[in-house]
Protein backbone atom coordinates (compact mmCIF):
# COMPACT_ATOMS: atom_id res chain seq x y z
CA UNK A 1 0.00 0.00 0.00
CA UNK A 2 2.85 2.36 0.92
CA UNK A 3 4.54 1.65 -2.43
CA UNK A 4 1.33 2.45 -4.31
CA UNK A 5 0.92 5.75 -2.45
CA UNK A 6 4.56 6.60 -3.07
CA UNK A 7 4.22 5.96 -6.81
CA UNK A 8 1.00 8.01 -6.87
CA UNK A 9 2.64 10.96 -5.12
CA UNK A 10 5.63 10.77 -7.45
CA UNK A 11 3.31 10.85 -10.46
CA UNK A 12 1.47 13.88 -9.04
CA UNK A 13 4.79 15.65 -8.47
CA UNK A 14 5.89 14.89 -12.03
CA UNK A 15 2.61 16.23 -13.45
CA UNK A 16 2.96 19.40 -11.34
CA UNK A 17 6.53 19.95 -12.55
CA UNK A 18 5.50 19.48 -16.20
CA UNK A 19 2.56 21.88 -15.77
CA UNK A 20 4.80 24.48 -14.12
CA UNK A 21 7.35 24.23 -16.91
CA UNK A 22 4.59 24.63 -19.52
CA UNK A 23 3.20 27.75 -17.80
CA UNK A 24 6.67 29.32 -17.55
CA UNK A 25 7.32 28.60 -21.23
CA UNK A 26 4.00 30.14 -22.29
CA UNK A 27 4.58 33.27 -20.18
CA UNK A 28 8.08 33.72 -21.61
CA UNK A 29 6.77 33.30 -25.16
CA UNK A 30 4.02 35.85 -24.57
CA UNK A 31 6.50 38.31 -23.10
CA UNK A 32 8.82 37.92 -26.08
CA UNK A 33 5.93 38.44 -28.50
CA UNK A 34 4.80 41.60 -26.71
CA UNK A 35 8.33 42.99 -27.04
CA UNK A 36 8.67 42.25 -30.74
CA UNK A 37 5.16 42.80 -32.13
CA UNK A 38 2.78 45.78 -31.80
CA UNK A 39 -0.40 45.54 -29.77
CA UNK A 40 -3.13 44.40 -32.17
CA UNK A 41 -5.58 46.69 -30.37
CA UNK A 42 -3.59 49.85 -31.13
CA UNK A 43 -2.33 51.61 -34.26
CA UNK A 44 0.46 54.12 -34.77
CA UNK A 45 -0.62 57.55 -36.11
CA UNK A 46 2.04 57.12 -38.81
CA UNK A 47 0.56 53.86 -40.17
CA UNK A 48 0.13 54.16 -43.96
CA UNK A 49 -3.23 54.03 -45.73
CA UNK A 50 -3.58 51.26 -48.33
CA UNK A 51 -4.30 52.44 -51.86
CA UNK A 52 -6.25 50.93 -54.76
CA UNK A 53 -9.03 49.42 -52.61
CA UNK A 54 -11.97 51.42 -53.99
CA UNK A 55 -12.35 50.31 -57.63
CA UNK A 56 -16.03 51.29 -57.74
CA UNK A 57 -15.45 54.94 -56.80
CA UNK A 58 -17.11 57.51 -59.11
CA UNK A 59 -16.23 61.22 -59.19
CA UNK A 60 -17.84 64.28 -60.79
CA UNK A 61 -16.73 67.91 -60.68
CA UNK A 62 -19.93 69.86 -59.96
CA UNK A 63 -18.63 73.42 -60.12
CA UNK A 64 -15.50 75.54 -60.17
CA UNK A 65 -15.13 79.22 -59.34
CA UNK A 66 -12.07 81.22 -58.31
CA UNK A 67 -10.04 78.05 -57.91
CA UNK A 68 -12.59 76.50 -55.53
CA UNK A 69 -13.82 73.13 -56.80
CA UNK A 70 -16.90 71.22 -55.64
CA UNK A 71 -16.99 67.46 -56.21
CA UNK A 72 -19.44 64.66 -55.61
CA UNK A 73 -17.77 61.32 -54.85
CA UNK A 74 -19.76 58.07 -54.68
CA UNK A 75 -18.23 54.83 -53.42
CA UNK A 76 -19.87 51.50 -54.15
CA UNK A 77 -20.24 48.11 -52.52
CA UNK A 78 -17.09 46.87 -50.74
CA UNK A 79 -15.05 49.98 -51.62
CA UNK A 80 -12.75 50.97 -48.75
CA UNK A 81 -13.33 54.59 -47.77
CA UNK A 82 -9.91 55.83 -46.64
CA UNK A 83 -8.21 54.17 -49.60
CA UNK A 84 -10.65 55.72 -52.07
CA UNK A 85 -10.39 59.24 -50.64
CA UNK A 86 -6.60 59.06 -50.49
CA UNK A 87 -6.47 57.93 -54.13
CA UNK A 88 -8.85 60.75 -55.12
CA UNK A 89 -6.75 63.37 -53.32
CA UNK A 90 -3.54 62.21 -54.98
CA UNK A 91 -5.02 61.91 -58.47
CA UNK A 92 -6.66 65.36 -58.29
CA UNK A 93 -3.72 67.07 -56.55
CA UNK A 94 -5.83 68.18 -53.60
CA UNK A 95 -3.84 70.36 -51.18
CA UNK A 96 -6.68 71.50 -48.90
CA UNK A 97 -10.31 70.41 -48.68
CA UNK A 98 -13.25 69.69 -46.44
CA UNK A 99 -16.00 67.11 -46.92
CA UNK A 100 -19.10 65.47 -45.48
CA UNK A 101 -20.94 62.27 -46.34
CA UNK A 102 -23.80 59.89 -45.61
CA UNK A 103 -24.23 56.21 -46.46
CA UNK A 104 -23.68 52.84 -44.81
CA UNK A 105 -20.88 50.35 -44.07
CA UNK A 106 -20.76 46.57 -43.83
CA UNK A 107 -17.88 46.87 -41.36
CA UNK A 108 -15.61 49.58 -40.01
CA UNK A 109 -12.78 50.34 -37.61
CA UNK A 110 -12.85 53.60 -35.70
CA UNK A 111 -10.35 54.75 -33.10
CA UNK A 112 -9.77 56.83 -30.01
CA UNK A 113 -6.42 58.57 -29.45
CA UNK A 114 -4.75 57.32 -26.27
CA UNK A 115 -2.63 60.23 -25.03
CA UNK A 116 -0.60 58.06 -22.64
CA UNK A 117 0.43 55.62 -25.39
CA UNK A 118 0.45 58.19 -28.22
CA UNK A 119 -1.41 55.63 -30.34
CA UNK A 120 -4.93 55.06 -31.62
CA UNK A 121 -6.97 52.51 -29.67
CA UNK A 122 -8.88 50.51 -32.28
CA UNK A 123 -12.64 49.95 -32.03
CA UNK A 124 -13.70 47.31 -34.61
CA UNK A 125 -17.33 47.23 -35.75
CA UNK A 126 -18.19 43.93 -37.43
CA UNK A 127 -21.78 44.59 -38.48
CA UNK A 128 -23.88 46.60 -40.91
CA UNK A 129 -24.14 50.21 -39.72
CA UNK A 130 -25.71 53.44 -40.96
CA UNK A 131 -23.36 56.37 -41.45
CA UNK A 132 -25.13 59.06 -39.43
CA UNK A 133 -22.39 61.63 -39.91
CA UNK A 134 -19.00 61.84 -41.59
CA UNK A 135 -16.90 65.00 -41.67
CA UNK A 136 -13.26 65.52 -42.51
CA UNK A 137 -10.49 67.47 -44.13
CA UNK A 138 -7.50 67.01 -46.40
CA UNK A 139 -4.14 68.72 -45.91
CA UNK A 140 -0.55 68.12 -46.96
CA UNK A 141 2.04 66.23 -44.95
CA UNK A 142 5.20 67.06 -46.83
CA UNK A 143 4.08 66.77 -50.43
CA UNK A 144 1.41 64.12 -49.86
CA UNK A 145 -2.30 64.73 -49.13
CA UNK A 146 -3.57 63.21 -45.89
CA UNK A 147 -7.25 62.44 -45.30
CA UNK A 148 -8.54 62.99 -41.75
CA UNK A 149 -12.12 62.05 -40.94
CA UNK A 150 -14.41 61.32 -38.00
CA UNK A 151 -17.65 59.34 -38.16
CA UNK A 152 -20.76 58.50 -36.15
CA UNK A 153 -22.22 55.04 -36.89
CA UNK A 154 -25.62 53.60 -35.88
CA UNK A 155 -26.29 49.89 -35.27
CA UNK A 156 -29.62 48.15 -35.87
CA UNK A 157 -30.85 49.09 -32.38
CA UNK A 158 -29.91 52.75 -32.84
CA UNK A 159 -26.80 52.54 -30.69
CA UNK A 160 -24.19 55.08 -31.80
CA UNK A 161 -20.45 54.52 -31.95
CA UNK A 162 -17.90 56.83 -33.44
CA UNK A 163 -14.41 58.22 -33.57
CA UNK A 164 -11.45 58.69 -35.86
CA UNK A 165 -12.01 56.57 -38.98
CA UNK A 166 -9.29 54.00 -39.69
CA UNK A 167 -11.07 51.99 -42.38
CA UNK A 168 -14.58 51.13 -43.58
CA UNK A 169 -16.10 48.98 -46.29
CA UNK A 170 -19.08 50.53 -48.04
CA UNK A 171 -22.46 48.82 -48.37
CA UNK A 172 -24.48 49.76 -50.29
CA UNK A 173 -23.24 53.31 -50.96
CA UNK A 174 -21.33 56.33 -49.69
CA UNK A 175 -22.38 59.77 -51.00
CA UNK A 176 -19.75 62.41 -50.30
CA UNK A 177 -19.57 66.10 -51.18
CA UNK A 178 -16.12 67.70 -51.13
CA UNK A 179 -14.93 71.28 -51.54
CA UNK A 180 -11.28 71.76 -52.55
CA UNK A 181 -9.51 75.10 -52.13
CA UNK A 182 -6.69 76.66 -54.18
CA UNK A 183 -4.58 77.57 -51.12
CA UNK A 184 -2.61 74.73 -49.51
CA UNK A 185 -2.88 73.61 -45.90
CA UNK A 186 0.11 71.92 -44.26
CA UNK A 187 0.48 69.55 -41.33
CA UNK A 188 3.32 69.85 -38.83
CA UNK A 189 4.66 67.22 -36.44
CA UNK A 190 3.61 67.83 -32.84
CA UNK A 191 6.16 66.22 -30.48
CA UNK A 192 3.77 66.33 -27.52
CA UNK A 193 1.32 63.96 -29.23
CA UNK A 194 3.41 62.51 -32.11
CA UNK A 195 0.55 63.58 -34.39
CA UNK A 196 0.85 65.64 -37.55
CA UNK A 197 -1.56 68.54 -37.04
CA UNK A 198 -2.70 71.31 -39.39
CA UNK A 199 -0.82 74.58 -38.89
CA UNK A 200 -2.67 77.28 -40.88
CA UNK A 201 0.33 79.62 -40.65
CA UNK A 202 2.49 77.33 -42.78
CA UNK A 203 2.65 78.02 -46.51
Question: Residues of each region from the PLM?
Answer:
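Boundary at the C-terminal end of the N-terminal hydrophobic targeting segment
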Residues: 29-31
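Active-site-proximal beta-strand/loop segments in catalytic clefts of secreted hydrolases
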Residues: 102
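Bacterial N-terminal signal peptides
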Residues: 14-24
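N-terminal intrinsically disordered, cationic/polar leader segments
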Residues: 33-79, 83-90, 96-97, 106-147, ...
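A general, composition-driven signal for non-globular sequence regions
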Residues: 1, 5, 22-27, 47, ...
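Bacterial N-terminal signal peptides that target proteins for export
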Residues: 2-16
Amino acid sequence: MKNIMKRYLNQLLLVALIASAFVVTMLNTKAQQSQTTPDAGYLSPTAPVATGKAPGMKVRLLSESGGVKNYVIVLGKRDEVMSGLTDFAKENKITSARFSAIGAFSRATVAWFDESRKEFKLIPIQEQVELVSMIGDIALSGSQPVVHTHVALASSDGTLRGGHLIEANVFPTLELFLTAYPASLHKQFDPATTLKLIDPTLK
